[in-house]
């Protein structure tokens, strides 16, 4: 995966596992929908039908954003993924991938049908289901990715985020000061971060994964493979219009004076199977109020409603950092305007943007830089940065360092590199599914 090559790995945390897990979830949703339909779609099961539709849409969304290119002007030509709407009744069925445009149209249809049916009253543990706010947060993210040439999608992002955030978003954001005040040792901060009772967490999902063993700075693997001083300079140790790293409520983990980087947010839990054998799993907040706020800020920016965008950015930074100064559109613009664009030799947080839509130089671009920077901090090691890289056509490099000296650039992924769509699992291709194209 590091080399952007196809992997034959089929174990936990592989593309194969993600593909299977998503389609298993889709199969469950389709079975529920079929059973409800067989009963005549009674009103008493409307909420369950709504959640099944949202679950089906979400799992196809995960697959599309992983194995397809970002939605854009070529979406009607780019390869999609099979959108399954019925329970499977045959062995080894053959499906067409369709196009990205068709996948997004189907997701939108499922969302719009399912959203008004969601009813939180049917759940005993609301945060472990696609409750109303979680469903609308998903809709906000989806329509942000479903970019239209005239940005008509952005008003839907705003409308749906408003349902999540209400009239005073600040009261629903994570209490980062309280999280940062907790001990960074043991699992105290991560357990608090994923707590379903936290007001910011809208949907908490469990997943069979060893990812926290790599991403948690409490483990040596993080420093070696995931986050070090070089990468931290662009994320958890970076400076923004809110100040330097000392302004963050949650500081990079540094027990015993040893160098550690990254915020402690995810932790691995062990489920013992037999003897000393165990399976790792994790909990993570798939949707949060903070992320919904940044979705809205980005939509405001694309619509050139800069004062409203700056107000959302300011609300986020006052929760996430210790900075008490109000950020205006002017202060945000000035900060990112003076930064140089990233190069492998001189990295900065400001990357050249090459989206499949038009953004203006100056205020609009610099507000986008700020939002991408904030989202990178907010969702560090949770996977959303990759979506921003794809959506904004950010060029990324594979760099070889000796100590802190850049020795060589071993690979480069350009804006239109087909490897931005991760290759389908080898077993899926062997079974007859059309693979993603490659240049070699």
Residue ranges and their predicted role:
Residues 2-68, 94, 98-102, 111-123, ...:
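Conserved, well-structured interaction surfaces
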Residues 26-29, 104, 111, 154, ...:
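Inward-facing hydrophobic residues that define packing positions of alpha-helical scaffold repeats
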Residues 64-71, 122, 145-151, 302-304:
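Short coil/turn linking the two alpha-helices of tandem helical-hairpin repeats
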Residues 66-109, 150-159:
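Short coil/linker segments at helix-helix boundaries
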Residues 154-290, 323-358, 378, 384, ...:
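Hydrophobic-face positions in mid-chain alpha helices that act as interaction patches
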Residues 285-306, 312:
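C-terminal substrate/ligand-recognition segments
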Residues 355-440:
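C-terminal functional modules
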